[in-house]
């Protein structure tokens, strides 16, 4: 069994966790949402400073919660890509320092691989191959998971990620940041069929549409025009109905592409990861469609949908058990394809 302490600081969560054999021993998350709410979104420099202020306490809390000594830790890991460079550097530097101080193996982990591994925290016996639907504020992708470190992108958004679309529509409706949870809550009492909105198909040069790629910029623009028209007419904004219609449109678009992709590639399991995996509309639509097509769909526990270090530790432990180690000179990258994961290891 492999026990790994991991650090996640790719954006606005300072997270530290210890995982043993895909079982979470401790998980600490210091959210920066209150800090960034006044700006309506994440400010990179503010995020980096907040990470610096909380990282040491988070590490100490994770060790205390796990009730483990450093002699029981087999490896130290940190998210190294993709993400905000300054934020990533805080976590990576802390992990390297701990690895050197305690003479432990060091591993850098791809943030999106972590979201794939979040499913293993509740489904430890899951075996590849399977389809991963990654839906977050920065990424929306369909990934063919072949084995640890081997991934193939089958579809993605051509512009705004799903989570980014939620935040932008929430800002348009003056709902605050982050937008996803607020829209989800309002949608519960709204009419999802009140407004017809575009699902964002991507045209192919030879005609027809890409079966797995999508676009959310047109949907965002459609909501903007809807709001402008209602305001011109002097009508009160039916926020609940707009939220429900928008959320249902996103859920349908993601569900159609995920189901089609799984069936076309003969994959019987769809594992969903990322912050939007917590969305109730997506969960309901995808579960119903999967059941109708004799497919299995897996969602992480809600606490592991958003950024956390447990998923990073889980991925790192799998790499460590295979003898994959990162050089202590490893740097951070703001962008890195999942297909390049193995470049992080020697």
From Swiss-Prot:
UniProt-listed InterPro entries: ATPase_NBD (IPR043129), Gcp-like_dom (IPR000905), KAE1/TsaD (IPR017861), Peptidase_M22_CS (IPR017860), TsaD (IPR022450)
Superkingdom of the organism of origin: Bacteria
Cellular component annotations (GO), alphabetically ordered: cytoplasm
Keywords attached to this entry: Acyltransferase, Cytoplasm, Iron, Metal-binding, Transferase, tRNA processing
GO BP: tRNA threonylcarbamoyladenosine modification
Transmembrane segments: none
Cofactors (names): Fe(2+)
Gene3D superfamilies: 3.30.420.40
Gene Ontology terms, MF aspect: iron ion binding; N(6)-L-threonylcarbamoyladenine synthase activity
Cofactor: how bound: Binds 1 Fe(2+) ion per subunit.
Binding positions for Fe cation per the UniProt entry: 111, 115, 307
KW DNA damage (keyword) present: no
Chain residues that bind substrate: 134-138, 167, 180, 184, 279
Record field: catalytic activity: L-threonylcarbamoyladenylate + adenosine(37) in tRNA = N(6)-L-threonylcarbamoyladenosine(37) in tRNA + AMP + H(+)
EC nos: 2.3.1.234
Subcellular location: Cytoplasm
Predominant localisation class: cytoplasm
Protein function: Required for the formation of a threonylcarbamoyl group on adenosine at position 37 (t(6)A37) in tRNAs that read codons beginning with adenine. Is involved in the transfer of the threonylcarbamoyl moiety of threonylcarbamoyl-AMP (TC-AMP) to the N6 group of A37, together with TsaE and TsaB. TsaD likely plays a direct catalytic role in this reaction.
Similarity remark: Belongs to the KAE1 / TsaD family.
Protein known as: tRNA N6-adenosine threonylcarbamoyltransferase
Annotated organism of origin: Trichormus variabilis (strain ATCC 29413 / PCC 7937)
